[in-house]
Every structure is written in C-alpha cells, then in structure tokens.
C-alpha cells in the first residue's frame, strides 16, 4: 500500500517543490526549461567562483535551501531519489559562466548516478572552455569495511557547501577552493539511524522494520545500513552511533581523540519530532564532552532529509580556528541556521534561579489557636481529596483525560508533605501565597494553574485585614482572576461554577453582624448544588468543551472537587465551634 503524500502529481512533485521554494524566496530564480534554481543576483558574482550542487529531490532542504550568498550559487534537482539530468547540469554551468564567473566547482554526493551525470556535464563544459572542477563528498561512517564504491555522501555535504561558499565569497580561486574542501571532506563522518522507512511518492515504503527495531547506518534513500538493533533509549542509541563512527576498527571512521575540536551536526531525516531531536542533541553533546571532545558549534535541525523518514544522523567535522571561521562566515541561505559564534563546550548553560523576594510586611497574623485551626483545615482538605481520587478520575474520563482525581491527590500529598516540614505562615495572606506557589509547582495541569491564580489573587485583600468582609473580598478577587485568565464563566461547566455559587453567598459576610458559620454553610450547599447542576450543562471551557454535550451526563469533576474542599473547610470550623 502506498503512503499518502500532499502532492499534485507524482510526476510533477519535484518541479512543484522547487517552484514553491523559488516563489517564496526572492533571492532565487528558476532556469527556464530545467529543474534548476539559481541565485537571482548572478551578475554580482562576476569575477568569482560559482558553486553548484544537487542530486535527487526528497532530501529537502538540501540542496536548494542552501543557495545564497556565502553558500551555493545554484542547484540542479532530479526527480525524487534520482540523479539530475546531464543537460540540466550543463545548462546551470553555462548560466553561471555567462554571468561572468571565473570557474565553477561542482559539489557532488558520492552516488554512482550523481558522479556520472555531474562528471559528464563537467567534461562537456570543459570542452567548451569553461573551467569546472568537481569534489565528490563521501562522509558515511557506517561500513567498517570500505567497498569499491566508497563512502556514501550524506549530511556532511552541507558543511562542504558552507566551507566552499565562504571561500568563494572571500574571492579565493577555483583550484584553491577545490583543494581545501577536498581536505575538509576527509575530516568528517556521518552516521544515521532510522525508526522506520520512508516512501517515494506513489510507491510503497522502501523497507520494513519491526516495532522493536531500528536500522543503524542506513542511507538517505532508504538503503540498508550495517545492522538492525533493538530499540533503546536516546542516550544508548547516540552512544552506540558515536562509538561506531569514531572507532578505529571501523575503516570509515572519523578519528576524534580526546582534546579534539569538532562541529556537531544533528540532522533530522525528515520525520523525527523536534522533541526527540532536542533529546538526541543533548545526548550527543553529553557523550562527546564526556569523552573529552570539545564541541565548537552544534547545528541542530533538518539539513538533509530522506522524505518523511523518522530518524536522525550525526555528523562530526574536525575543526581548527581557520576552518571554524569559514563555518561561521555570513550566509543568506535560507536553510542554514543562525548559530551564535560561541563554543558549546565551556559555555555556562544554566543561570541560578532568582531568589524569592522577601515577604512584604503584613499587619495581620493569626493567633496561636487560629494557626492550629488552619493546619487542621488543610489536613482535612487533603484527606478529603485523597479519598475522592478515584471518583474524580471516573468523572473526568467522560470529558477529559481521566486524571482530575490524580491531579488533586498530587496537590493533597504536596500540601501534607509541606505541613510536615513545619508550621505554616501565621498570616492568612502569606499562607495563601505559599499554597499558591506550592500548587503551581506540584499540582500541575490547568487545575494547578487555576488554583494558583485564585489563591494569589485572594491573598491580596487579606494583607490589611482578616475580618469577614476581607475574606469575602478575597473570594471575589480569586474568582475574578480565574475568570480573567481561565476564560471561563459561570455556566461553562467548570470548577468556577461551584466557587462562584459559594462566592455569591459569601457576599453576606460583608454585612455588619454576619454569622460566619451560617453563611458558610449556605455557601457550601450552594457550591454542592452548582456542582451537581453541571451535569446538565454544555461545557464552555476546558477540554470538555471539545466533547459533544450528549456525552456529558455526569457532573464536572473540577466543580465536585471545589465543592468538596469547601465542605471540608466547613466541617473543621464547625467541629472547632468557630
């Protein structure tokens, strides 16, 4: 079965892709009648060396993404995984020659079709009197025994584009550029690993891998690698890759003894997530530095892909300061990363976390008995939430990811652990602020953020007073913050429904002579009724808002949890005769 591809036609996909790149990049032009992209400022290259490269399509952004000042002059593209036509290569050579360049260097990956076609075009151009040289790049470090065909050309070719481009931009002659990049090409190695195959448009996958296997050392066209290994962690696979490509027992290895300086290239083969790419980059940096290798630059991204192949290749280039300056030289090529000219090894990679600001003076503190009461309230809230864990999870499975109870239990355990460390702040405002930070850090999820917002805002009115009107104002402030940032409103089937209902009842605390427990009892009953009523509501916020209302026939777990917290507070205060 062929895989799905977003193309207009199988036959025209390479042309369409190149046309799209040129259409969106004013510094590029197509060469009429050919699958060739050139710099649009060719006339500015008069008296300089031109650099041409290319190969089969399907390796984007290679090679056309590397056209620009300081890199390639132009690229000749073939059909997917197919060498470009000799006629198009020759047309590109003639085009740059007619623009007044003093010679052309062809940078070619080591594949038979590319060598033959670029080589034939070179000979024809030389017969016409055009100075043309060719460098064949073979940086594959997969095979321990070299075959007659030599090492395959892989992602390291892009580094040759960069070095040659910097030299050409500096006005260096054709012969010297050819000699210098030939030396550089021998000082690097690349090794890839794939989790599964890719597929050419209109065709089946190029190979199959078992679910627990990865292919080590495969080519960028899906060619077989050196062996298949069992799936392992990113750290283990990266360590294996680096060991294989630097081992002296490997005839195609790149020698990287301790103390060496390298440029590291972490290349996405097309289908790897950026998350995985970052993990692999970290593993590669740690592994190399652990072996005493100094990393001058680390280039991470997609440089030479194999269509949608989920895999990665690592390239190591041995560098000294002169070569590093060429890597760092400016370029306008769209696919070259903007990397700081700073050594990776030796750079301070973390900054000390800011110290917490000193607590602002607070005129309100709870007396000893009141402070003990706060501890009892918090302990009972924790016990209540732990007992509701499975019930809340069950309610959440209908409309979310089934972790509401787990999230609230995590908060309860964090609070219980915090209480064991010592007495909580005696100031209600400081207590709520501490709880806010604790929940933001430990509870997680949107619930942690919402409770954190609520408590942070609620703490503000309690800095000056802690009478009943101040506690009512605290409830108002917390609800306002939840609505402002959570974008929920009463009736949206969220925890806000319970808290809002309670908050309306607590307005009575602002009246002179208000009875604290009577009003709180009414507030809790209203919160519980509001929580139960959410089962008849259509969700307007949160994950449940994406679920059909026909499937929501249970109360919202967040609302149930909020009502249960209020009930726990009431029960402790009643037992204490507050």
From Swiss-Prot:
PROSITE patterns: DHAK, DHAL
Positions contributing to ATP binding: 401-404, 446-447, 486, 494-495, 556-558
Modified residues (Phosphoserine): 350, 511, 545
Annotated active site: 221
Domain of life where this protein originates: Eukaryota
GO cellular component: cytosol
Start and end residues of each DhaL domain: 372-571
GO terms for MF: ATP binding; FAD-AMP lyase (cyclizing) activity; glycerone kinase activity; metal ion binding; triokinase activity
Sequence ranges assigned to domain DhaK in this UniProt record: 9-336
Protein role: Catalyzes both the phosphorylation of dihydroxyacetone and of glyceraldehyde, and the splitting of ribonucleoside diphosphate-X compounds among which FAD is the best substrate. Represses IFIH1-mediated cellular antiviral response.
Protein name stated in the entry: Triokinase/FMN cyclase
Organism this protein belongs to: Bos taurus (Bovine)
């Amino acid at each position: 079965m062929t895989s799905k591809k977003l193309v207009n036609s199988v036959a025209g996909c390479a042309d369409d892709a190149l046309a799209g790149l040129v259409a969106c990049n004013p510094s590029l032009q197509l060469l009429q009648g050919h699958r060739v992209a050139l710099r649009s400022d060719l006339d500015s290259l008069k008296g300089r060396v031109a650099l041409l490269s290319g190969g089969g399509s399907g390796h984007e952004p290679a090679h056309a993404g590397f056209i620009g000042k300081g890199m390639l002059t132009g690229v000749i593209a073939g059909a997917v995984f197919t060498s470009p036509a000799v006629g198009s290569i020759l047309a590109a050579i003639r085009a740059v020659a007619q623009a007044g360049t003093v010679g052309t260097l062809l940078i070619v990956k080591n594949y038979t079709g590319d060598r033959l076609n670029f080589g034939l075009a070179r000979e024809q151009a030389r017969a016409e009197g055009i100075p043309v040289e060719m460098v064949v790049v073979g940086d594959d470090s997969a095979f321990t025994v070299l075959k007659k065909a030599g090492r395959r050309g892989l992602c390291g070719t892009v580094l040759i584009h960069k070095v040659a481009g910097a030299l050409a931009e500096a006005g260096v002659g054709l012969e010297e550029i050819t000699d210098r990049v030939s030396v550089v090409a021998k000082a690097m190695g690349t090794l890839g690993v794939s989790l599964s195959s890719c597929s050419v448009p209109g065709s089946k996958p190029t190979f199959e891998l078992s679910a627990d296997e990865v292919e080590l050392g495969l080519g960028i066209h899906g060619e077989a690698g050196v062996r298949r290994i069992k799936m392992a962690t990113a750290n283990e696979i990266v360590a294996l890759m680096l060991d294989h490509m630097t081992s002296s027992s490997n005839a195609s290895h790149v020698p990287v003894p301790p103390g060496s300086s390298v440029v590291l290239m972490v290349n996405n083969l097309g289908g790897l997530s950026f998350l995985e790419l970052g993990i692999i980059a970290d593993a590669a940096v740690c592994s190399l530095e652990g072996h005493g290798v100094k990393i001058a630059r680390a280039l991470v991204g997609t440089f030479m892909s194999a269509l949608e192949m989920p895999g990665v290749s690592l390239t190591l280039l041995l560098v000294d300061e002169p070569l590093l300056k060429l890597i760092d030289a400016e370029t306008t090529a769209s696919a070259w990363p903007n990397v700081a000219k700073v050594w990776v090894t030796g750079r301070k990679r973390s900054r000390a976390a800011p110290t917490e600001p000193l607590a602002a003076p607070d005129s309100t503190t709870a007396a000893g008995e009141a402070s003990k009461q706060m501890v009892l309230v918090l302990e009972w809230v924790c016990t209540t939430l732990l007992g509701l864990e499975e019930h809340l999870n069950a309610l959440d499975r209908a409309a979310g990811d089934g972790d509401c109870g787990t999230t609230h239990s995590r908060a309860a355990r964090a609070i219980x652990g915090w209480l064991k460390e010592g007495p909580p702040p005696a100031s209600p405002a400081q207590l709520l602020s501490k709880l806010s930070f604790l929940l933001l850090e430990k509870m997680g999820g949107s619930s942690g953020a919402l409770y954190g917002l609520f408590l942070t805002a609620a703490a503000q009115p309690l800095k000056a007073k802690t009478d009943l009107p101040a506690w009512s104002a605290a409830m108002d402030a917390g609800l306002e913050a939840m609505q402002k940032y959570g974008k929920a409103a009463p009736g949206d089937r969220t925890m806000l429904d319970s808290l809002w209902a309670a908050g309306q009842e607590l307005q009575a605390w602002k009246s002179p002579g208000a009875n604290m427990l009577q009003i709180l009892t009414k507030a809790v009953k209203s919160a519980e009724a509001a929580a139960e009523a959410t089962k008849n509501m259509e969700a307007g916020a949160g994950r449940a808002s994406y679920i059909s209302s026909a499937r929501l026939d249970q109360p919202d777990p967040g609302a149930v949890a909020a009502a249960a917290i209020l009930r726990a507070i009431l029960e402790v205060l009643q037992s204490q005769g507050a």
